[in-house]
């Protein structure tokens, strides 16, 4: 299946869905945030998958959102890792949670992003955490779920 190569900034803004086909769209830095842009996974060098393209169609749709993980090595892309790091920091800094609750929530954060067999557990833990943490932490975790959560998480949380 012929896919294009996408160009995305380190903060997850999509610059081009098909930078390999339209090199004139390439930008070394993001015009929205100023971050460096990439076209390949920093861990393994695989191209970032853009959109499916058929030569006879001639139409290149834009990416809905930046992919969370590399298809070749499974590593989180920089924007995903950054979001996970921020969510971890929010959880660690909130005194309302016990050490065990912090550890459990942090361990299930990847299951908020990707739908896995553990996603339902992640939703239950997230709901529990949202009910006891400060409003600042709750707002940050809700925003994390809105921007990076899989559809099941968004649906279960009513986002």
Residues of each region from the PLM?
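Transmembrane alpha-helical segments and their cytosolic interface motifs
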Residues: 136-147
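Short amphipathic alpha-helical segments that predominantly mediate membrane engagement
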Residues: 2-138, 156-159
């Amino acid at each position: 299946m012929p896919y294009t190569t996408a160009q995305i900034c380190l903060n997850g803004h999509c610059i081009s869905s098909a930078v390999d086909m339209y090199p004139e769209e390439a930008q070394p830095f993001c015009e929205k945030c100023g971050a460096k842009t990439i076209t390949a996974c920093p861990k393994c060098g695989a191209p970032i998958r853009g959109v499916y393209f058929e030569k006879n169609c001639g139409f290149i749709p834009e990416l809905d959102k930046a992919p969370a993980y590399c298809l070749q090595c499974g590593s989180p892309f920089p924007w995903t890792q950054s979001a996970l790091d921020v969510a971890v920091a929010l959880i660690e800094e909130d005194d309302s949670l016990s050490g065990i609750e912090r550890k459990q929530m942090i361990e299930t954060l990847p299951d908020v992003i990707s739908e896995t067999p553990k996603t339902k557990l992640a939703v239950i833990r997230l709901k529990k955490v949202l009910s006891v943490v400060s409003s600042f932490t709750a707002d940050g975790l809700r925003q994390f779920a809105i921007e990076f959560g899989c559809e099941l998480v968004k649906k279960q949380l009513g986002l």
